[in-house]
Amino acid sequence: MSDQRPRDENDYDGDGFDGADVNEHLVEGESPRDGYATFGIQGESFGHANEEMDLDEYVAEHVIGDGSAGPGAETGDAADPTERALTTGIVGDNIVSKKAQRSGDPRAAAREAEEAAALRLRAREIEDEILARTPENNPEPSLERVRRAMELLGDPQTSFPMIHLTGTNGKTSTTRIVERLVRERGLKTGRFTSPHLHDFRERISLDGEPVDVERLVRVWDDIEPFIAMVDHESTSNGGVRMTYFEVIVVLAYAVFADAPVDVAIVEVGLGGAWDATNVADGVVSVVTPLALDHQRLLGDTVEDIAHEKKGIIKPGAFAVVAAQVPEVDEILREQCLEVDATMLREGDAYAVTAREAAVGGQMISVKGLAGEYDDLFLPLFGAHQAHNAATAIAAVEAFLGGGETKIDDGVLRAALDAVTSPGRLEVVRRSPTVLVDAAHNPAGAQALREALADSFQFNRLVGLVAVLADKDAEELLLALEPTLDHVVVTRNTSPRSMDPRELGQLAAELYGDDRVTVVDSLPDALDRAAALADDEGVGGGVLATGSVVTAADVRMLLGVTSS
């Protein structure tokens, strides 16, 4: 059985995950809801992507629900949606305000229901408007459009200090740990990560929660005319409209300024120098481990990738650099010298001094910039997460006290204890245990394999693997081969997903025909993997991996959509 602290299967929070893929499931004009609808999953964020409906229909379907269960069942489930809102006080997953209920005016609840419905419908329209733009897996290598939008908006990105993170693997977990630490310190935080699992609002969070619909709609309505102006200027000069990712970045920085936040913790989307997030200057720049990924866009060697990533290190900043291969380390060192940034290297300025697997995570000790931190509980699995935590601690020390002041012990322990990283070696079901992990490149798969060996014990572990066609599927499968007793290959909801037959052929060459099963549909593949895991009785498990999309798909299939 897995060495994992039992917890409520429905209690999953947080909104991010590791991996450098940036909303890899999207093509131009496509909503993530389109893909999930093919699985027959009709959640409020995914089903009926292109249907038109009036407000009453939307209230009935998305805000109030079908009346088949819940508090309304006890009151007769009025057929009229408004009446159901009045009698139950529940509007879908939104509780009508207690003030409205206490007032004795049932119409107030109905008005709130309609207002909530209108806001949610408008938010969905906004998402679809943004999705119609060039997708983020095909970025335009320029900062001109984002800079122009920022200028027109009064440069909101200058209204808050920023901790900026780049890397190949580990940057989302590190971003989440940094955010939790500074929030526990009492600062109001804005966090930007990508891609999202289930709702694009996950990308933009305030104090750890996705931006609320009311603020999203209001800020979008404020900035949309300026985005249209930039589009017009660019296309009039033979350029392109702002891309999906560029617009999301502008929206995020505007939301952070509107809040306002005390600090923004921002993960790059892709690369560094020409990533849209780089219109803001980080007072602390963090570089997590670099490896080969997105070679089409970033280059075929780690040196090429390092030259792109180093662009987030700005003059006078602190550069917190996780352990790198020597070639990468030298490139980053030269950048720090060139811009007069202070380089704080893992192994020199900070380090993991001890770690031991524990129930529900691990115990770690860290040498920080300002002192030692011993016997910290981290509820994440694997040595790579211990190093991510150490990097996050160093980044926060640099931000709060220039690396000269220790983080308060109570603050540190409370923050780490509350850290989550959905989609990263996450337990989403029991009997059999189902894990999801967003590993999508060989380095990520190797870290996953080591974390499994370190933290879990299965009598039989079955892989459920779906990867994108432009990824190094062979090396990913090879990295996992010693860990998996059997592998079920399939496709995920991305139109870029590799054909299962092609993936199965690769797997058979590495694993042997008797250890490989090909299933075309992911829901059927999940059922098959679970059955294979149960073949030898208790102690079996399923590992769903190969892509951010695969992790999100399996979470959705198993009803884990909280983010």
Segments and roles (model prediction):
Residues 118, 137-139, 143-158, 184-280, ...:
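ATP-dependent carboxylate-amine ligase catalytic core
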Residues 263-268, 275-286, 290-292, 304, ...:
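Nucleotide phosphate-binding/pyrophosphate-handling subdomain across enzymes
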Residues 1-167, 174-185, 192, 232-239:
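Short functional linear segments
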Residues 56, 230-235, 260-267, 282-375, ...:
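Acidic, Mg2+-coordinating active-site environments of NTP-dependent enzymes
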Residues 192-195, 322-323, 337-357, 377-383, ...:
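Beta-strand->loop->alpha-helix junctions that form or flank phosphate-binding loops
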Residues 547:
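Active-site-proximal loop/hinge segments that shape catalytic or ion-binding/gating pockets
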